[in-house]
């Protein structure tokens, strides 16, 4: 869709593309360049806050109190995507990120419940998430 139209809706831009690139730990400067080169509305006043402040949470929390991230369930609810193998990959990246940043999420009242949810998962599920995430991250 982006390659065809040079445009993504705000939700697609932040909660799908930005979210995925963030969970993959892509350098925010590379994300910014990619967004600038591919979006028809690629102006600094749009892309600087979209990339650095929102989707990549690389401004130190100046624009938002938590990263714009989600598991596959949010994507399924907000889109017409069908459940599939991508859900396990997405969830592995998401939960691995939550676990790797436990201190941050524990301190934030809006996200502390995510640590409890992660901790309740079985050891097998956690091990699988870590393996999938490590295989995908650069």
Residue ranges and their predicted role:
Residues 1-138:
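C-terminal catalytic domain of photolyase/cryptochrome flavoproteins
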């Amino acid at each position: 869709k982006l390659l065809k139209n040079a445009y993504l809706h705000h939700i697609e831009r932040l909660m799908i593309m930005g979210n995925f690139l963030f969970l993959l730990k892509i350098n925010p400067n590379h994300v910014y360049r990619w967004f600038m080169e591919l979006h028809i509305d690629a102006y600094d006043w749009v892309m600087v806050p979209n990339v650095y402040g929102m989707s990549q949470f690389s401004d130190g929390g100046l624009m938002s109190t938590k990263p714009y991230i989600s598991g596959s369930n949010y994507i399924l609810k907000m889109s017409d995507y069908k459940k599939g193998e991508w859900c396990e990959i997405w969830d592995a990246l998401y939960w691995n990120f939550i676990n790797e940043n436990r201190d941050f999420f524990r301190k934030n009242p809006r996200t502390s419940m995510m640590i409890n949810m992660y901790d309740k998962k079985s050891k097998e599920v956690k091990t699988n998430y870590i393996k999938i995430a490590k295989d995908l991250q650069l």
